[in-house]
Curated annotation (Swiss-Prot):
It comes from Arabidopsis thaliana (Mouse-ear cress). Its EC number is 2.7.12.2. This is Mitogen-activated protein kinase kinase 2. Changing T220A: Loss of interaction with MEKK1. Normal phosphorylation by MAPKKK5. Residues 70-330 form the Protein kinase domain.
Amino acid sequence: MKKGGFSNNLKLAIPVAGEQSITKFLTQSGTFKDGDLRVNKDGVRIISQLEPEVLSPIKPADDQLSLSDLDMVKVIGKGSSGVVQLVQHKWTGQFFALKVIQLNIDEAIRKAIAQELKINQSSQCPNLVTSYQSFYDNGAISLILEYMDGGSLADFLKSVKAIPDSYLSAIFRQVLQGLIYLHHDRHIIHRDLKPSNLLINHRGEVKITDFGVSTVMTNTAGLANTFVGTYNYMSPERIVGNKYGNKSDIWSLGLVVLECATGKFPYAPPNQEETWTSVFELMEAIVDQPPPALPSGNFSPELSSFISTCLQKDPNSRSSAKELMEHPFLNKYDYSGINLASYFTDAGSPLATLGNLSGTFSV
């Protein structure tokens, strides 16, 4: 691939001139709407095509969480579109993550918020971060999410540098269970799988989060062609503008496993620099260079094979999430003897310490 030779079909997810007003997304009663999604100060729901145009008001359930019942403890994440706060329920003492997104932003981000709300509302899987409730009020969307007190794998890697084989197997077995649910049960491509979107907790659980750039296909074999997500973990077929499917997430998974095994991002910057100075040079490296692999030495052949199976340039040569669950790397260990909860705690995860709760969530 020559420098600057990206496909003319490449679609960058950037704001466009003349974006539509926020009023397009609001009803006269102040309900946030997008397609079949409705959110207001009382909650969220997905309407069916059979429901009439004039809808009955969204009514809060008796056991529903309310924003007024939550006390803010600390800001644990910031982004261009909002913040994530650690909050505590006044009556039960339970902690939650409250993601607050202001809607005075461009239409592309509003559409991404709507997509995340739809997936959160309709997904039930123990390997995805739980979304308990969503609200729209005073110009902001608020999502009450499960609080993962160990932070992200990106945070964890800063402490441990690299993760041993047996723990890697236990961690990514859980991640794959989440991907099987997304890919095969829901026909969803995550499109932004990376260490900061894999969260851990004191129970040793690992869960996938952040569905803002995910897309829903009509079936498991569906293809998409939109250029969104984090470039570092993007598959070659997505970078060049080709259509892509669930296997693009498998490429991202392979890069994440490789990074967790070595403690380093798989694509080394040129000239021994610390970081890539140009995202386009990085994307060219992903497309032009051979797939990265584990260095020879201190790694099991099963782990090396697992990563190689994920990092195939041709997506048709990659295994699916279901097929990867049968890989020897995920079946060589006795998981009853692998205590991820103790490993996360002993290895330096910032578990349950309110003075050290930064970087846990992204917006």
